Amino acid sequence: MDNMKIFDSHVHIGGTKLGFDMTEEMVSEMIDKYNISKILVSNCDSAEVDHDLNPIPMEYQVNQIKSLERAINFAREHKDRVYVAAWVKPLGETITDEFETMIKDNLDIIKAIKLHPFHSNTSPVDERCIPYLELASKYKLAVVSHTGGCEAASPVHLYEAAVRYPDIPFVMVHMGLGTDNTQALNLLGKADNLYGDTTWVKADVTKKAIEMYGGKKMLFGSDSPIDGLDTYMYNKTGDPSIYREYMNGFEKEIGNDNYNLLMYENSCRIFGV
């Protein structure tokens, strides 16, 4: 792992109200320990509904400006290594002048809009999300979106958004979490600007995606440090993580060129870094 470049496109801070403990200090230690070259980080404090799709009480919510400010401050401490996906709140907020200015003034580190159709229970093609897609188009940002777990988060809705906005790169995070990924795999081939990531996706599914569509459709992502400092190696129970195969031996399965695309180059291209 010491000689490879890794761009983890799915890293988090925050999330206390969802039961997570993901601090900037933990992420900093993690990327040093595992020699991660670059990361794209989003702040889970922007969640609007809980794991049961119940609204998080307003007194416990963090507005999207404060959430983004925390992520920006973290990225500024790690120049050219930490980039930001701005996790937005379409269920209860809108784009204000202040929010757009914050995006515009930090385009050197903000590289994506983060949608979470589960934790906002709002589809990417819901009218409340459209202004955020317009914002991504205006500032040439990618859109990374959770898929899976509820109807609003179905991969088909991200595909619909990709068709509507062909200028925006869309990343299907999880490829349909909790499914066999078949729907997401099929959708990958239907839009040139639609991509997948490896977060909780088995390596054989990623290999199949590469066999079906070539090496430029999948990005490495992990949800780190959701299972702790060593998410790349172990899950919360101490059993081997799904990411071990990606980091140890997967290069032999898909070839050097495809491996470099998956683990580093695709994210650099899609996020423009």
Locations of the language-model features?
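Active-site gating/metal-coordination segments in enzymes
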Residues: 54-144, 194-195
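Conserved, mostly hydrophobic/aromatic
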Residues: 10, 31, 71, 102, ...
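Hydrophobic faces of well-ordered beta-strands that scaffold small-molecule active sites
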Residues: 6-11, 39-41, 82-86, 111-115, ...
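An N-terminally biased module of ancient metal coordination in phosphate/nucleic-acid-related enzymes
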Residues: 1-69
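Active-site environment of divalent metal-dependent phosphoester hydrolases
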Residues: 14-16, 46-49, 90-94, 120, ...
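H/E-rich (His + Asp/Glu) clusters that bind or coordinate divalent metals
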Residues: 169, 176-273
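Active-site gating loops and adjacent loop-to-helix segments of metal-dependent hydrolytic enzymes
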Residues: 34-60, 107-110, 168, 224-228, ...
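Distinct, well-ordered alpha-helical segments
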Residues: 94-104, 123-132, 151-165, 180-188, ...
